[in-house]
Amino acid sequence: MSMQDTFSSPEHFTVLLREAVGGLALKENGIYIDGTFGRGGHSRFILSQLSKKGQLIAIDRDPQAIQVAQNIQDPRFRIVHDSFSAIPDICEKLGLTGKIDGILLDLGVSSPQLDNAERGFSFMKDGPLDMRMDTTQGLSATEWLRQVSEQDLAWVLKTFGEERFAKRIAQAIVGYNKSAVQSGAEPLNRTLQLAELIAQSVPFKDKYKHPATRSFQAIRIFINSELDELEKVLNGALNVLAPQGRLSIISFHSLEDRMVKHFIRKQSKGDDLPKGLPLREEQIQHNQKLKPVGKAIMPTEQEMAANVRSRSAVLRIAERI
């Protein structure tokens, strides 16, 4: 049995398991955070490497993930129902600011979320148009699409989905909902309904990608404030991590990876200082907050063959200075 089989759940194949956890350079007595518990693959592997004195704090905003986590009966383990952007606040409450030895983030949608049609993330299965990571709060995709303007929707599709036909798709969606309201019919409220409307709006089809892929990604990212959450946790991690503490982050699309890459690069250079200041080399180096650990890591051919959803994964690791 492979490591992925051991620490993955029947419904979720943990991506880059060995590499992401290995990137934390685990200390057996260390304190770690799994900011995206999901179905617990990374968390279970981390726990298997810790001593009785080690600690793991897991976080997830998905109520279904919280239910899974509550089945882990381990005194070293704590689960928190929140967004990973709350990591600084959580650490402050626990008295752990500056004491965390590593933070792992596995960004994006989990397989159980995609495979459960009732969550509304998939354009391949019919279900209610929801798309919320945390179904207990915020607007669903259905509710948001009923009130958004054509201009704002086009901006979301272009910005978060890099969709070249954003204006066409936005016009079709807003037009459909307006017509539905005027005729007394139901506005868009099903995933396949939206996917079909998008497909009809796109003049050119990519034979390798469903025409609704980028739009569903964009709406999901906006509904869940995913990039805002990522920016907050990146900035907050600097105060949370102990010296030599590690960041291990798996991203699944270029927008996320670009943010992580640029953040690590910026923090490894330090703050911009005016040219010409009489600074010694050690003063300049002291200004640096992170150093990258190795290069970006992608799944092996073997992993991609076993789990097609891993093909876009990129892992980046950095260490607190």
UniProtKB/Swiss-Prot annotation:
GO CC aspect terms: cytoplasm
EC number(s) reported in the record: 2.1.1.199
Domain of life: Bacteria
Residues that coordinate or bind S-adenosyl-L-methionine: 40-42, 60, 84, 106, 113
Subcellular localization(s) per the UniProt record: Cytoplasm
GO BP term, example: rRNA base methylation
InterPro entries in UniProt: RsmH, SAM-dep_MeTrfase_MraW_recog, SAM-dependent_MTases_sf
Signal sequence region: none
Pfam families: Methyltransf_5
Classification via Gene3D superfamilies: Putative methyltransferase TM0872, insert domain (1.10.150.170), Vaccinia Virus protein VP39 (3.40.50.150)
GO MF entry, a single one: rRNA (cytosine-N4-)-methyltransferase activity
Catalytic activity reported: cytidine(1402) in 16S rRNA + S-adenosyl-L-methionine = N(4)-methylcytidine(1402) in 16S rRNA + S-adenosyl-L-homocysteine + H(+)
Protein keywords: Cytoplasm, Methyltransferase, rRNA processing, S-adenosyl-L-methionine, Transferase
Entry's family note: Belongs to the methyltransferase superfamily. RsmH family.
Function: Specifically methylates the N4 position of cytidine in position 1402 (C1402) of 16S rRNA.
Protein name as annotated: Ribosomal RNA small subunit methyltransferase H
Species annotation: Histophilus somni (strain 2336)
Gene: rsmH
